[in-house]
Amino acid sequence: MAAAVAVFVFGLCVYGYAIQLPFRIDDFVHFRLLSIHTLANVWLGEAGLAYYRPLPFTIWKVINVLTGGFPPVVIHAINVICHALNGALVLALIYLHQSRTAKGLIVGSVAAVLFLLFPFSYQAVPWAGALTHPLVTLLMLASIVTAVRAQDGASRALRVISLAGTVLAPFAHETGVLVALGLTLFLVTSGRAKNLRELVARTWPYWLISLLAAGSMLAVRLHAGSPVAPAEMESRLQNGVYFVQGLAYPAAPIATRLLGLAPGLNDLGAVLLASVPVLALLAFVCVRLGQGRLVLFGLGWFLFMVTPAWLLLAFSYVVDGPRLMYEASLGAALFWSIPVAILVDRWASLTTVVKRLAAAIPAAVVVIGAVVGSAGFLAERADMYEQTRLASVGMLQAAVQPAEDKRNILSVNFPGWIAPKTATYALGHEGVSFIPEYSSPSDLVWAMTGVDSPMYNAVVTELQSHWRFNYLNYGSRWTAPDLQPQLRIARQVLFTSYRGQNLATYSAGRLEAENMARDDAVAASYDDRLAVRSGDWRIVPEGLLVTLHWQSWLTLTQEVRTFVHMRDAATGEMAAQEDGLPLMGLSNPLWWKPGDQWADTRLLVLPQTVRPGKYALWVGVYPADGSARLPALDAARHRLPGDEVMVGIVTIP
């Protein structure tokens, strides 16, 4: 019991960060549909959903009814809890498989840890919409564990629970029809079924339910007009290699190095070359050392669970769906835990420290290598998921602010997809999808807050920055000059910055007013054409966010750039600066009209050399060709030294 609790807590720790994440990809579509459909629609297949998986949608609909929305923390917590429970059930299953021995406890604990850290589960747990995979796995494992306990003479109530789980599993995901196959594999490889007759007696109710469920699923798909046909042979071959990579996950990264060493080798060949010999060698050694039943259980489970996707899905879908290996990951985790089983069996017969050390090293290398590799891979994905959260914060804050103005928000360079610079595995797309083409950040705002916020999304490539991850932005491609009319009609302009270590979405400013009378009570005017009225600022994790309030007096006759310099208030030494066009590079004063008043926000990234203290903020304007600054006058029409004005003193703590 203590080991199961420890495994459960470990599972919560691995993916606990996910409860803070925003929704993504299909979540927006699913929740929109659920908000207008009833539970009856869901169970009758009339909710417009792509797949008939009513159980997870029922959970979300009940939450929606009870809370009036789709609270992200609650919905993400369900995925995380299911995953952690699955880890505990993996331990229980292997413990029972090994007749409740110390060996079963040790091997089960190791397998549970590897299961919880399986790298290709990075999509299934943090993505709310992938609940189908942790949920069906929970129902399948719970059904098998309770079935075995009931057959061992425990409470008859466990038999009822087991059969109920078997009935419900297919309604979570199509893989749920494999409960009977999983139970049969368990009984055969554990030696609990002595002959075929006993095996049939123990499993026939589960086979009956599974076959009825499979027939029902087929009928529903045919009724809905969904295709039910095997994938093309090429896809099946590619799918097979992709799943081999998943099974061999601790060794499979070698394939990326092989690609660099052998230019004529393609990714499929590299995966096979890196994976198959390792899998064959490990299986051979484990069988020769008396672990044939565990090898059969692990490999058999993995094979059975990936078979539906291998046969039916196109490779283009599979290669984007590492979550498809979630149910099968138990088999991979067990397979790579078998060296520990060998060590446990041989431990008592090893009479010297040297012999025990020699036996422990291979097992430790395999398990620790798998743990370290997986943990590093998952940590990088957690970082990418966190970036989507950070990018969302500013957008959500801006979108939910009460505003009588119903004009669109203009969002520029918001992330739609983030991926590592270097791939770990030769096959697959290892990035984190966020906003798909068929959805929009407006849907994100609605799903997270319940607020419908009209939004226009643009990608301005000349303002994209090199960053530590690869990324794609969501929206239509525009140049900054072409975007000027959109800036004038937006109630707020949001800009996602990639300049720092972390993403941040800021309010870049907006057109505050038009056709305003000339205001001579300004901080400074420049060439009698442009005036800065005031400035304010706030410290943010990425630096100093400065907002300048401008008024256009006359149309400019040349391209200009504006600057904000932060200098030591005592010495005048430059500490940080930001030169460029207003609104984080989006708005060109050349197109401002007389009487326009603009709020212009820009980010000053503070170097690590900036010490705590007081700093003056200076503002000026100069021609884009770099020639002398425009003459700056104060409100009394006196020329300002250096043609710049101090708009305030900021204290850096």
Range-by-range predicted roles:
Residues 396-653:
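C-terminal luminal/periplasmic domains and tails of membrane-associated envelope-modifying transferases
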Residues 1-451, 486, 490, 494, ...:
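Polytopic membrane enzymes that build or remodel cell-surface glycoconjugates and lipids
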